[in-house]
Amino acid sequence: MSPSSHKPLILACGLPLSGHIMPVLSLVHGLTDDGYEATVVTGRAFEQKVRDVGADFVPLEGNADFDDHTLDDLVPGRKDMAPSFDRTVQDVEHMMVATLPEQFAAIQRAFKKLSASGRPVVLVSEVLFFGAHPISLGAPGFKPAGWICLGVLPLLIRSDHTLGLDNDRSPEAHAKKLAMNHALEHQIFVKATAKHKEICRELGCTEDPKFIWEHSYIAADKFLQLCPPSLEFSRDHLPSNFKFAGSTPKHRTQFTPPSWWGDVLSAKRVIMVTQGTFAVSYKHLIVPTLEALKDEPDTLTVAILGRRGAKLPDDVVVPENARVIDYFNYDALLPHVDALVYNGGYGGLQHSLSHSVPVVIAGDSEDKPMVASRAEAAGVAIDLKTGLPTVEQIKEAVDSIIGNPKFHEASKKVQMELESHNSLKILEESIEEIASHDFGLLTKSDEETEDIPVKGPALAVSS
């Protein structure tokens, strides 16, 4: 559809990591198809993908312009750290908080460009793009008509009864979670929280932000969680701006089948394995999965390496019943798949379940344990509770999923639930509601006539 001058403009933002920006781009693709004009702020590694969905591109600068493969350069000592909570704390401080000024400056550059139209601009960001926070806290500069935040991760907002790891509501668990809730803000993330407040003050905010994990949930005009309710633990209280929106929309893409596509179509059973786009070593999951299933009768294993041009190490022998490809359209393969073995990314779970495919999860970093616990509680997954599973663990888990119809039945229920939520429609309704209420439109402070500078010690990456 041609762009419409009657629609509000969209400014979308996301961290330059695949799991964060790709869900945003999926929705932006739908918006541009429906006649919206969109601009996207993210890292240069994703510029072509931004343009491919019909949006204009504004790059992040400086330390904010990282990507999946340069994180170790941004966070001191990261490459030597095993996946752990300590590494997550470091990631938050250096990747999300320290880069906030550069993110905010990029948003302001984009707003300045869009302001000439005189049309309302709606800000759409993902939950960990902290550069949107100062806009809700009185910082000088251009202001959007309103802010919509997208939940591209399991819910991070605290509750008396859940920390995102289980649904235990016993008195003992309740007391433990209350203590952990306090520790998250006042001990574990105390440094990041203090730096977050300091940066916001330096940028001219007239209010202090909420706890770093929760500000986006509370301050956004609309918060759209990109999953169905069954993939979240129950909560006693959620903000009034919160809504479950289902998974991101599917888009038709050109599909050129590989030479072995006939093997997929004729196989009695197909198992897909991938480590996503941020694999450190294919020997962590893909190689042991190929080994685990090499003697399975009537089974074809398809391994997707996640990056164009990627290859398995030279010493890996690919079994006869396996096919390996560098990059592949998931939506083309998943309708033929009986089970997915993967490392627990949030988007991968939604993608798989949108085709009613149950999963085996082997992931222990970032948000992957939270994803796995939700998937297992929903009955659609087996959580191996490790990022380095053995051949025996993988074989047993795949056999269990294939041999027990309850996993496919539960996956089908979630698929139907996903289909009852139209995330693009929900987003467009939210955009139009915000624009029609004219929440400040595109305004700026009296003194703000030039680009917002990136200033202050917040730019320094401390060790």
UniProtKB/Swiss-Prot annotation:
Keywords: Glycosyltransferase, Transferase. Pfam families: EryCIII-like_C. Induction: Induced in early stationary phase (at protein level). The keyword Chaperone does not apply. It is an enzyme of class 2 (transferase). Its EC number is 2.4.1.-. GO terms for molecular function: hexosyltransferase activity; UDP-glycosyltransferase activity. It comes from the Eukaryota. The keyword tRNA processing does not apply. CDD domains: GT1_Gtf-like. It catalyses: 18-hydroxy-(9Z)-octadecenoate + UDP-alpha-D-glucose = (9Z)-18-hydroxyoctadec-9-enoate 18-O-beta-D-glucoside + UDP + H(+); 17-hydroxy-(9Z)-octadecenoate + UDP-alpha-D-glucose = (9Z)-17-hydroxyoctadec-9-enoate 17-O-beta-D-glucoside + UDP + H(+). PANTHER family: GLYCOSYLTRANSFERASE (PTHR21015:SF22), UDP-N-ACETYLGLUCOSAMINE--N-ACETYLMURAMYL-(PENTAPEPTIDE) PYROPHOSPHORYL-UNDECAPRENOL N-ACETYLGLUCOSAMINE TRANSFERASE 1 (PTHR21015). Belongs to the UDP-glycosyltransferase family. Catalyzes the first glycosylation step of sophorolipid biosynthesis, the coupling of glucose to a hydroxylated fatty acid to give rise to a glucolipid. Can glycosylate all hydroxyl fatty acids generated by cytochrome P450 monooxygenases CYP52M1, CYP52N1 and CYP52E3 into their corresponding glucolipids. Main products are 17-O- and 18-O-(beta-D-glucopyranosyl)-octadecenoic acids. This is UDP-glucosyltransferase A1. It comes from Starmerella bombicola (Yeast). The gene is ugtA1.
